[in-house]
Amino acid sequence: QRSKFEKDARRLVSILFSKSPFKERKQDFNVWGLCPESREPGISRPSTGIHRRSRIGATYDAFGSERYVLTFDNRSFRDVASFAPYEFVEILVNGNTYGGGGIFGLYSTVAADSLWSPYVFVHEFGHHFAGLADEYYTSDSAYLPTADRLEPWEPNVTALKDPKQLKWKALLSPDTPLPTPWRKDEFEADSRAIQTERKKIRADRRPESEMDALFTREKTEVSRILGTDQYSGKVGAFEGAMYEPRGYFRPEEDCIMFTRDEVPFCRVCQAALSRIIDLYARGPEK
């Protein structure tokens, strides 16, 4: 299946380089593709009784999340990666079930045959490449909620303890209030219905096409809700981020790190990504 891997890799890399700031900085990247042979095709998904002997041990259901794809076999992963010079790694897994994962400074993953692989590839690479936080908060995550709202280290979320010291204040749009109002209640009501149906699809082990249809409907509804407010497209501090509906804020109403909508990285995320590109392409600032 080497030819399939090459087609998938070229397709997904081209999508990454269609997004800013990668689009403008494509010349600063070298991309290598490695296609190690596996004993069996496909990827493990223990929650549905599927187990595969893959070369690097990638699997769904990481940390109990059915969509979270990781490998815990670091030695095998590093053995494969050592055949090319690398700073960043994206692992393509041979599956069509929605899923992926991204860990800052380690690797990111995506199910290459999923309808949503273009989005997941870019979103998860944002985690891996620049330590971007998840801005969504209405779907289940593999992490426990926090009792305290400490200021996160990630560049694109804040606890907004002191609006005057907002970490992205240099990008703040003029005359934008903090916190910044948006159609939060309407968004959450819609999301609750979607998440209920999402869980039922997985519990009933229904075809992946039904999940794809649900996500497509969600995308239409969310695009209708977002993007039409007074502060849509503005940089502010919109409550709801990092798996929490209260107490954490994101820079813009919508972003690749928030929804599957047809939107770019927000300006704060773009700035964070650009800093990492500069670090590797130009060296540290003196």
Please describe what each predicted stretch is:
Residues E37-P41, G95-G99, L115-S117, E135-Y136, ...:
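Solvent-exposed loop/turn segments at secondary-structure junctions
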Residues N30-G33, F88-L92, V120-F121, H127-G131, ...:
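Structural recognition of the beta-strand scaffold that forms the well-ordered cores
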Residues K23-K26, A81-Y86, I103, D229-Q230, ...:
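Extracellular/periplasmic catalytic domains that process cell-envelope and extracellular macromolecules
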Residues F125-S141:
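Catalytic Zn2+-binding segment of zinc metalloproteases
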Residues G42-R45, N74-A111:
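Catalytic zinc-binding patch centered on the HExxH motif and its immediate surroundings
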Residues R2-F5, G100-F125:
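Short pre-active-site segment immediately N-terminal to the catalytic Zn-binding motif
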Residues Q1-D79, A112:
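Propeptide-to-catalytic entry region of secreted or membrane-anchored zinc metalloproteases
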